[in-house]
């Protein structure tokens, strides 16, 4: 099979998988709905107010957010892997998600304790500040270490520190807000509204568009900084853009859904294997489709496996994503031995 045919077939398969999972998200849940009822609700011809409410106010915004944030998280992971030249770099592993989680928890506890309401924009700004602070620590460590394995360990430790401080912060929350904070800190797509969708789209879509515009410089950067400079890529400016975009995407995900593990590592790796190419121009769209489908699948499992009880989304993504990362590490180890 030629590379072009493989790319087209791979994109079609990912798009079909995404469409099927999105449809399943609408009529599969604790309240079973037929495809006819879902179509009637979507087209405004639904007669049952309960079914219409479940579809338009609960399941549809949740499915849209799962797809949107899944695409953002996968793209953020790929940008970080490009920046650090390490296939296991990702928002969760490098501590970026945990830094965003800490900042959001601080803002939520502060606002809730004083009886104030937190807007989506405030949470995104807080998450971005926390993500950038965590990234600053990682970059400071990067200047002192030569081995990428040590840098990854530093990122993991920063994540643990942020998570521990977050637990202390939650301990000072009022009793009425502890449950919401706990559910959010475990990762979940529940409770999404159309207002959340609009705010997230205003952040994620321009950031993804900017990432696509960086595809060609990214390809040069993957060949080495010296080569990138020789073709006119400003290395320092390009690196800053990668850091800003990846942190912004990861922060947006954390602000709305909490920290979600392994999506940013596993999906880019799987997409590259599927496409048979590592070119950013091809991998980035695949990451968006694959990340959206992966998060929709994990969300379906999280809310359906033990319904009406709902699992945290991170627990499900870890079950599927961790084996991929383990396989990647074993493969790299075999290559190093050779």
Model-derived features: where do they sit?
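Alpha-helical transmembrane segments in inner-membrane proteins
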Residues: 1-338
């Amino acid at each position: 099979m030629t590379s072009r045919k493989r790319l087209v077939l791979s994109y079609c398969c990912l798009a079909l998988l995404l469409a099927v999972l999105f449809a399943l998200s609408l009529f599969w849940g604790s309240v079973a709905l037929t495809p006819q009822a879902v179509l009637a609700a979507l087209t405004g011809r639904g007669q049952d107010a309960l079914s219409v409410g479940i579809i338009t106010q609960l399941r549809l915004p949740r499915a849209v957010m799962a797809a949107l944030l899944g695409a953002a998280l996968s793209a953020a992971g790929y940008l970080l892997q490009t920046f650090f030249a390490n296939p296991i770099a990702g928002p969760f592993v490098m501590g970026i998600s945990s830094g965003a989680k800490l900042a959001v928890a601080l803002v939520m506890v502060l606002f809730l304790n004083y009886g104030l309401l937190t807007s989506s924009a405030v949470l995104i700004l807080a998450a971005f500040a926390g993500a950038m602070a965590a990234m600053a620590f990682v970059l400071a460590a990067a200047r002192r270490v030569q081995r990428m394995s040590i840098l990854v360990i530093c990122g993991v430790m920063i994540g643990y520190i942020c998570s521990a401080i977050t637990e202390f912060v939650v301990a000072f929350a009022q009793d009425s807000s502890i449950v919401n904070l706990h559910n959010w800190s475990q990762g979940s797509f529940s409770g999404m509204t159309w207002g959340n969708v609009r705010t997230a789209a205003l952040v994620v879509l321009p950031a993804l568009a900017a990432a696509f515009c960086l595809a060609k410089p990214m390809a040069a950067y993957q060949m080495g900084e010296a080569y990138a400079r020789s073709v006119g890529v400003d290395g320092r400016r390009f690196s800053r853009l990668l850091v800003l975009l990846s942190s912004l995407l990861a922060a947006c995900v954390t602000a709305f859904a909490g920290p979600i593990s392994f999506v940013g590592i596993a999906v880019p790796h799987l997409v590259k294997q599927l496409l048979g190419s590592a070119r950013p121009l091809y991998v980035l769209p695949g990451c968006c489709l694959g990340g959206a489908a992966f998060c929709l699948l994990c969300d379906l499992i999280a809310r359906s496996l033990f319904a009406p009880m709902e699992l945290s989304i991170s627990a499900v993504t870890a079950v599927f994503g961790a084996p991929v990362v383990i396989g990647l590490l074993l493969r790299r180890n075999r290559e190093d031995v050779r």
